[in-house]
Curated annotation (Swiss-Prot):
GO terms for biological process: tRNA methylation; tRNA wobble uridine modification. InterPro entries: FAD/NAD-bd_sf, GIDA_C_N, MnmG, MnmG-rel, MnmG-rel_CS, MnmG_C, MnmG_C_subdom, MnmG_C_subdom_sf. Belongs to the MnmG family. SUPFAM superfamilies: FAD/NAD(P)-binding domain. PANTHER family: GLUCOSE INHIBITED DIVISION PROTEIN A, PROTEIN MTO1 HOMOLOG, MITOCHONDRIAL. NAD-binding protein involved in the addition of a carboxymethylaminomethyl (cmnm) group at the wobble position (U34) of certain tRNAs, forming tRNA-cmnm(5)s(2)U34. Homodimer. Heterotetramer of two MnmE and two MnmG subunits. GO terms for cellular component: cytosol. GO terms for molecular function: flavin adenine dinucleotide binding. It comes from the Bacteria. The keyword ATP-binding does not apply. This is tRNA uridine 5-carboxymethylaminomethyl modification enzyme MnmG. The gene is mnmG.
Amino acid sequence: MGYNIGSYDVIVIGAGHAGCEAGLAAARMGSKTLMLTINLDMVAFMPCNPSVGGPAKGIVVREIDALGGEMGRNIDKTHIQMRMLNTGKGPAVRALRAQADKFAYQHELKKTIEETPNLTLFQGMVERLIVEEGVCKGVVTQAGAEYTAKTVVITTGTFLRGEIIMGDLKYSSGPNNQQPSITLSEHLEELGFDLVRFKTGTPPRVNSNTIDYSKTEIQPGDDKPRAFSFETTKFIMDQIPCWLTYTSTETHRLIDENLHRSAMYSGMIKGTGPRYCPSIEDKVVRFNDKPRHQIFLEPEGRNTQEVYVQGLSTSLPEDVQRDMLRTIPGLENVEMMRTGYAIEYDAIVPTQLWPTLETKKIKNLYTAGQINGTSGYEEAAGQGLMAGINAACRSLGKKEVVLGREDAYIGVLIDDLVTKGTNEPYRLLTSRAEYRLLLRHDNADLRLTEVGREIGLIKEERYERFTNKKLQIEQEKERLSSIIIKPRPEVQELIRNIGGSELKDGIRASDLLRRPEMAYEHIHLLVPSEVELSDEVKEQVEIQIKYEGYIEKSLQQVERMKKMESKKIPVDIDYDAISSLASEARQKLKDVRPLSMGQASRISGVNPADISILLVYIEQGKIARVSNQ
């Protein structure tokens, strides 16, 4: 017999990286919010790599921060090392990556949640949803407790019917040997959701005291203070290095000889694994021409000897893992502390979601994170933030928020999921974004702070600092456009010293900055600013001036795309009534139910001819008759 515990505006199921962002966002927006998790000791836990950021992912963390989310602030307080990646490349692919103290990260974020008004954290396993006439009204826990709510967000990670697999050993479990969520997965199927089976994996952890670091290459953090969050003013300078080593021919021989014992190759694993994070078995088989593969040794925290062996994700048996580790330079005498394993879990087919992350099947129910078929903490956190924002908006009677592909990598991520779906764990890459020159690490605050303020997640003090930064950027750009630099001897000398061509006549400072060999600091030496500018302002001025032409082209592409996005498609359109559509296109359109012609054009299997037919059909005004049938 169930018993009612209480009523909330928003209930979040799960307290991983998606759940934490969802719960915090909803509560901070003024919604009475409840977070339910299987184990309070696992809030914000990092079950796999102890890091945040990297290519594309680091930009997502910046976007989360610009919108008012927590991940950036939290990693800034708890990292052991931070590095800017791809500094030798263009600004579109630069990204920050932090090595986390995973235990400090977890403790700090749990503390933030516990201290947040409007937010209640409780240990309990949700087994089913309360659904009435296609509307989600709350949840029921294993203990029989009923919690009613205006909206519910599911962020269950890899817990849904989770199974850990290692060699021929297979048992029901969530990550890190936690209790899995089996009944909720079965309940979602009963409600009519299509589920898929995915797989991911993690490498072994080893004892730092047993590593011979003299045989490895040190990988230090950056000397320059770095941060993900716009709010961070105190920087951690006491950094801990990572270390680089490689597999050997002996490693590969051992793996080849034991492939039949790997769950990946014995048939034990049925789920689809991540393409961009393959197991060491996969790497050895698929890239058998490579004599070695990189292995990074990453400390898991400041107060532990556990080291994460990045690059060695595996489902081989324990004895093979131990032998394999000892074939790697520096690890000849290593002691393994935890085994690597593969984990299979259920995910929903994400084309069953609207761009708000609300499910199409059940109103007021949202999903975010690995349940939507993604991999990675950052992808989960970005979805969790948006799902929490939209669940709160619905509960408060406000308009929901959808980020476009031109607005953010988070927008690219969600649009890919709900429009194209995924047949493998989805990882965000810079190559997935058409407008990546617009979606840079350095301008996330300029793109999204206004959105965060409108939502109610950006405080006034921060907004004032942001507007001051924007003003300084514009004023400095105007200053450089108004100053003429003449070919004086000191000017010519500086230009010669950096390998440039001497001036023949006077030139605007902004035009001189457009030269590939010129940096803002060179211009500043010639025409210094009277106002002291931050490094972030200087960087923004240089990028906006130097890449102005390319940025303008991207903005023109965005405008063309927006014309297609502005052509709306009625939700209840009857695609069967459009006889000239190709059968594959008709089925895909019925499955996805796109909201605009732009979204329809991105569906796999819908070609330009189908789009033209659909466009003509809508413009002829037949929709009303179809809708009224």
